[in-house]
């Protein structure tokens, strides 16, 4: 049995005694020996909540998801309930006079069972204020485990160290029956088989054994041995045909529930194993186990169902909800099923029977006549209609050839064998020298080995090309020209896809000339076209279009190097295929609910022709057959992505897209016609920007006006000195509360009155007063502003400042006559041309003055000479005045 086991999350902590999964959230609950309870998100690996419950060990804990609770039982004899969203304690009561070992929650009723070292099991009702409904007595030692029967929740089983398992019914005080296990030591764990096909339960004991029981015949079906120490637990997996057991020897063992043989032994390095949980819905086959040094969450595979769809709509699958994994079912998709959008199809299901292996893959032959079931190292080929065995054998992997009469497989020795008409072709072989991991079907035989993919010719086994890629899947188009290789990253998750073109002619030419490298093949055989950076979970080719589902629950298609979304889903979906008869792709979820999504074949054909450079043919021959606005919109979006803007503009029925395309191609008038006055401001602004780029200023003004883009209008009006437009803009800006923009508009327009009124409106009285005085608004107007200024100062408690403010007579530009003269007269300010003339006049006047400078200077000196002489005779200030001296006679 192949199990893709991955460690999803592991955390070190104190000893984990109890563990449980939340049914819908990615949470795991752990109860610790230290008395703590921890809630972890195993997808983000972040602790959601931690609660210190008590100082004694907490041995049991469960989610009660429908109430948003967790319930725990501990060695202080108490049961506590917490709201896991808030951490608030809901209830706390003493449940037993001894340690509480196990807790079980009824799947539908408000009941909780608790098993204890006091030798009893008790039933509690949370809707009745956690009243004790019933006490079940009869065990002679510690009750280690209690479990409800999922097929009949009115009964439950209890496992005890007295080496018995008792089965009880709610409401009855005595057990229905007691199983004496025959195990040499006590029973640590008991669990029911979850599916309806087998009346089994399982027990784990300190005598190192695991026993499977038929509780109807009360007989032991099988005994499993292999652990080296006490077995702490053993459980049936809810979806896989396996049993998981854990022991104090530190290992987890995975057993085949059909053959009861060990398939895998795991040691995660966390010492002794104490507890187990399986995801209640089987999501990604999660299991979680608690150990001495922490806990781990493991994924035993993905959620992809095992199914196959043939070319005419016949579906075959194994397992499913409430069915064993080996059960095979079929249904026919007729294409006329009427369902609501996003609702599954109502299909008539028929059971074909069961197979002797655990089916790990189902595959129809290319024509749908045969179905292969592969699992447990075997393959069986059945006829699709009667489900009769056609061929069988041992294999590690199996793929169909290009026709329904040929196939290849990996045999027990690891060699590839080729069969034609159900007989081995002994003369056929492939030159492989390393271990083979997997085979891929298609136009060429794909072989995965050692991190490479090898492509071989089906006819003669010749190596066509070796490609260095760690492939998860290889998907070929129907015409054998295109191939999508789904790559995996280092974690084994889907990382990306590569679209390759197979050059068959180049390969045949090299083969004819004998130019094939033995280790690399033909270099020119494949060309890489595109890389698809998506997490691909499943995919199919429809023509040259690749349709696929993603890990983010999207249905997309990839064409021309671009990805387009078709639909979103709330859960993970897997692509079954495309039926041209219905124009639909079909998908299924993990429970094999089938969904259909309509897709236009004409749209795909149009895109295919366009990518081949035949766009004229696509427009002439295919486009007239395309119906519906959605299909035309998809084509227009595709053409836009391929930069066919003119063609997309002519085709698109979507007004928004046409507007965007009209801007791209410069058809501004068309873009204007597509808009209305009520259109979004963003579109008008985009039109305005495009108009500016093409110097269409008139259209730019109209667009910015409708967009209410005042800043852009200010740029335009000020650039063209449009005073009327600036005044209108200023008023609009003032109404919009954009006072700075409004003032600038008034200022550039020369509207001093408007600027003054705006300053007063915004209570900028000081600036308004100086503005009015400087630009000659009149003393009366200035005094009115000053009065308001003073009143505002007084109102704000600035009386001293108010007293110092003068009126118009103290401001620059005032006059005694009351008619203020402006210091700067905007109206009389000369224009640039007049200013140049004045400057020339000043130059001429300076030359005239310079020519007469000598005469002027001489005249000035004559006038200043006697004055200078007189001044020299006078003493300076502060100098002593000498006494007059008499002349000698």
Curated annotation (Swiss-Prot):
Gene Ontology terms describing biological process: endoplasmic reticulum to Golgi vesicle-mediated transport; intra-Golgi vesicle-mediated transport; intracellular mRNA localization; intracellular protein transport; late endosome to vacuole transport via multivesicular body sorting pathway; retrograde vesicle-mediated transport, Golgi to endoplasmic reticulum
Residue spans of the WD repeats: 11-41, 53-83, 95-125, 138-169, 182-214, 226-256
Q: How is the protein disposed in the membrane?
A: Peripheral membrane protein
Q: Which UniProt keywords apply?
A: Cytoplasm, Cytoplasmic vesicle, ER-Golgi transport, Golgi apparatus, Membrane, Phosphoprotein, Protein transport, Repeat, Transport, WD repeat
Its Gene Ontology molecular function terms? structural molecule activity; ubiquitin binding
Annotated compartments: Cytoplasm; Golgi apparatus membrane; Cytoplasmic vesicle, COPI-coated vesicle membrane
* GO CC field: COPI vesicle coat; Golgi membrane
> Mainly resides where?
cytoplasm
Where is region (Disordered) located?
806-889
Q: Where are the transmembrane segments?
A: none
Tell me, in a sentence or two, what this protein's role is. The coatomer is a cytosolic protein complex that binds to dilysine motifs and reversibly associates with Golgi non-clathrin-coated vesicles, which further mediate biosynthetic protein transport from the ER, via the Golgi up to the trans Golgi network. Coatomer complex is required for budding from Golgi membranes, and is essential for the retrograde Golgi-to-ER transport of dilysine-tagged proteins.
UniProt-recorded name of the protein? Coatomer subunit beta'
Organism expressing this protein natively: Saccharomyces cerevisiae (strain ATCC 204508 / S288c)
Q: Organism classification, top ranks? A: Eukaryota, Fungi, Dikarya, Ascomycota, Saccharomycotina
